[in-house]
């Protein structure tokens, strides 16, 4: 969603599914229009379709947005110049994930995220040519325990 004025509810615009944020919202209690025709659309061109969670940072080496998420097989990355069009997912870090885990498999991971401790941005939302991949690794056959580790793996990014 986008707006130029946070205080003005009528100025908010949502993604319409095209190439811009041009969908206006309506008040379902005061308007006679169909509220379903004014919903924010999803980005259906992100692949693989089952990639989940993760982190979104701007990579200062590739000059693109870098999304790291998880899917069967491990942690994946996608790149985008504009947050609309995305590259196909590439395997970033092979690992077992929780939703296809069975006892006896390698310990699964969740929540992959990139953080560059040298980032000068306020929220560490930029990544340069080196960063760390953080993730949670679960133990004990995914029983309801707190037996898990926060793991940090150094990475290098080249153009």
How does the language model describe each region?
Residues 114:
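Hydrophobic, well-ordered secondary-structure elements that form the walls
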Residues 109-111:
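Short hydrophobic/aromatic beta-strand or adjacent loop that forms the aromatic wall/cage
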Residues 1-53, 58-104, 119-159:
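Beta-rich carbohydrate-recognition and catalytic domains
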């Amino acid at each position: 969603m986008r707006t130029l004025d946070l205080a003005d509810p009528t100025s908010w615009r949502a993604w319409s599914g095209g190439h811009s944020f041009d969908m206006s919202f309506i008040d379902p209690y005061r308007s006679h229009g169909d509220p379903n025709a004014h919903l924010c659309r999803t980005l259906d061109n992100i692949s693989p379709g089952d990639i989940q969670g993760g982190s979104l940072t701007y990579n200062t080496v590739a000059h693109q947005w870098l999304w790291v998420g998880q899917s069967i097989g491990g942690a994946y990355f996608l790149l985008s110049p504009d947050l609309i069009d995305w590259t196909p997912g590439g395997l970033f870090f092979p690992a077992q994930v929780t939703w296809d885990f069975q006892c006896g498999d390698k310990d699964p991971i969740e929540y992959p995220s990139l953080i560059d401790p040298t980032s000068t941005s306020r929220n560490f939302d930029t990544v340069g040519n080196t960063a760390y991949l953080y993730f949670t690794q679960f133990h004990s056959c995914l029983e309801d325990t707190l037996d898990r580790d926060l793991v940090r793996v150094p990475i290098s990014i080249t153009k």
